[in-house]
A protein has these predicted regions:
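Conserved small/polar residues in nucleotide/adenosyl-binding loops
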Residues: 141-142
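Hydrophobic/aromatic anchor residues within beta-strands of the central parallel beta-sheet
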Residues: 115, 135-137
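Class I S-adenosyl-L-methionine
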Residues: 2-127
Length: 143
């Protein structure tokens, strides 16, 4: 579906790029090519600007990071492709990604009409729905 184009997005530009992508999606216009969104959206994982040296232990650092990121980690595109190729789902099989984020796995599925996903991050869900409009993607509310 979308080509994997390796990106080196500087840490200090990720939040800005994410905001521009979300603005483009919200505008309802094709301001940014979908392939660019697929390759450039980073979510909140890695945006924390925390330094391990500022904490007394790795555990404190990891807990602070987890609180900020909500445990978010986007599986790299190549790994998603390899996993889907290994599983080799048919176009008739239903596939569920219970923590779909921006939907990286959906990019490699044979039939998006049989793809289901949910996530707790509304921004990531908005990106996934935009990129994979045929898939069934829901926002899971948490308290």
């Amino acid at each position: 579906m979308y080509a994997i184009i390796p990106q080196q997005i500087p840490q200090d530009r990720r939040a800005e790029i994410n905001e521009k992508i979300l603005f483009a999606i919200d505008s309802g216009k094709d301001l940014v090519p979908k392939e660019s969104i697929y390759n450039c959206y980073t979510g909140i994982g890695g945006l924390h600007n925390l330094r391990q040296a500022d904490f007394t232990s790795y555990h404190e650092y990891a807990e602070a990071k987890k609180e900020f990121e909500m445990g978010q980690f986007f599986t790299p595109h190549d790994i998603c492709r390899s996993m889907v190729e290994t599983l080799s789902p048919t176009s008739a099989e239903m596939v569920l990604d219970m923590c779909c984020g921006m939907g990286n796995f959906f990019n490699h599925l044979p039939n998006l009409h049989n793809a289901y996903g949910f996530d707790i991050d509304g921004k990531a869900v908005a990106v996934a729905r935009y990129l994979y409009s045929e898939a069934h993607i829901c926002l899971l509310y948490t308290s």
